[in-house]
Amino acid sequence: MLLTEIDHIAIAVKDLEAAIAYYAEAFGAEVHHREIVESDGVEEALVKVADSYIQLTAATRPDSPIAKSIEKRGEGLHHVGYRVDNCQEALDAMIAAGATPIDKAPRPGSRGTTVAFIHPKGSFGTLIELVQENPGSGH
């Protein structure tokens, strides 16, 4: 099976600190990992709620994909991250099934992972991130 589980649900936010505080108060969420991803122009906080992970993501520059998403659609659901054993194989399978890739090849992601994004136009309106854990990466 190419997709093994949901890795995370990503929420685009304007104010990362306010979002972290809200999820902590409302759901008892704890920050599990925090990172600035310069290449994507974002700062993210991976919070754990029960057995699930929510990636709160804020723009660090106005030209980042998160800034553009918030400008166009407002804050809210950004993408679903699916865990895969092999990012390249999963990307190839999705393209063969008719998906439109944003990333033509897997690339480094946060937490030491390897990732590739699939455009919403080819996946029924949902931005998809394929997430491959590597040795030393993961939650």
PLM features per residue range, with description:
Residues A19, A29-E30, I54-Q55, P62-P65, ...:
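Short loop/beta submotifs within extracellular cysteine-rich repeat domains
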Residues E5-D7, A29-G41, T60-H78, A93, ...:
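A cross-kingdom feature marking solvent-exposed beta-strand/loop segments within repeated
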Residues L2, A45-L46, Q55, Y82, ...:
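Vicinal oxygen chelate
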Residues V37-Y53:
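C-terminal "cap" of GNAT-fold acetyltransferases
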Residues I6, V13, Y23, V47, ...:
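Short, structured motif recognition centered on aromatic/hydrophobic residues
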Residues M1-I20, E75-V84, Q132-H139:
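N-terminal beta-strand motif that seeds the catalytic metal site of vicinal oxygen chelate
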Residues A19-A24, M94:
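Conserved active-site tyrosine of GNAT-family acetyltransferases
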